[in-house]
Amino acid sequence: MDFDTVHNRFGTHCVKWDMMQPLYGVPAETGLAMWVADMEFRPPHCVQAALEKMLAHGIYGYYGDDAEYLDAVRWWMQTRHGWSVDRDQIFTTHGLVNGTAMCIDTFTRPGDGVVLTTPVYHAFSRIIKAAGRQVVECPLSIVDGHYEMDFAAWDARMTGTERMFILCSPHNPGGRVWTAEELHGVAAFCQRHDLILVSDEIHHDLVMPGQRHLPMPIAAPQIADRLVMMTATTKTFNIAGAHSGNVIIADPALRARFADRMMAMGLSPNSFGLHMATAAYSPEGAAWVDDLVQYIDGNRQVFDAGINAIPGLRSMPLQATYLAWVDFGAIGMPQADVIDRVQKTAQIATNHGTAFGMGGESFLRFNLGCPRATVVEAVARMQAAFADLQ
């Protein structure tokens, strides 16, 4: 597989590159786009071939007969994650941000609290607030350099108005693969406080060697009556523009409520996205993912070695995802000055930690889903930008 080729995405209506200068002041011609969580790699050939077949046919009508897609989802979940899913449990959404919004709309009411384990994926908070719900932040604790859950502290934050818990598993931006014990703890917490659990597992295929992701239905089957699962091909295969995702619900009562809401919204599948996803969930796609994970792990090692060599900087150990979470807190520099050095001196666009909620204030998130040469260049620029610390 070729992950080393640098592809010019500037001028292709690409958020990551075409919006970098307007939002961050980093010019696309000389800057490095390491913010938006999509990768710089072309998807596997099977995905390209599926699109070429559609283009050759030349008629782009409404999508129907999703049996092949549903079987591909079921095959992937069983073979890659040991998770058995029935066809009638799978709903197709326009990506998982849309899926999250649908879950909030279906299972909560305006004014209800939605629990987030912060710092966490920034879109969650935005959607919750836009829907007229309340964000309830349950901060993660840093123990031995990585995030852990403090259920006793979280219990103390509950007021009785909370109705939903959104879990990011694996965790973005901290890169944690939650253990069976931690997942059991989340399940018990949701039972204790009568919360619907929405488990966003979009990064579940991007787990580093030596780590194992556990789907929540396997880790805690006892909460099937309050569990909503979310998965997608978009992160795994770098096809975010396809806007497709899965909401998977085992409980019939929850499933009926979600189906009614989807009908009321008039949603229908994206034909291009489902053709791409069907092709991706295949043996060829699986082989590509295996190679991708090895490559990202190599990027992680290069990045961590270079960043951690800068006194006071620390890249949190990455167990999953291609997103490095770097803490600048120990250097004693105002975060505005840190950002100024990264964006103006190093000319790197990253995600600011404040967007991820409580606990993210001293962090920046770097996207390592790129050619190795880009990672090497980013490290060199960071070392030069913070040379006075050495």
Identify what each model region corresponds to.
Residues 1-12, 67-69, 73, 130-136, ...:
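Conserved long hydrophobic alpha-helices within structured protein cores
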Residues 54, 61-94:
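Conserved N-terminal alpha-helix of the aminotransferase class I/II PLP-enzyme fold
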Residues 26-32, 36-53, 84-86, 91-390:
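PLP-dependent class I/II
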Residues 1-61:
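N-terminal "arm"/small-domain region of PLP-dependent enzymes with the aminotransferase-like
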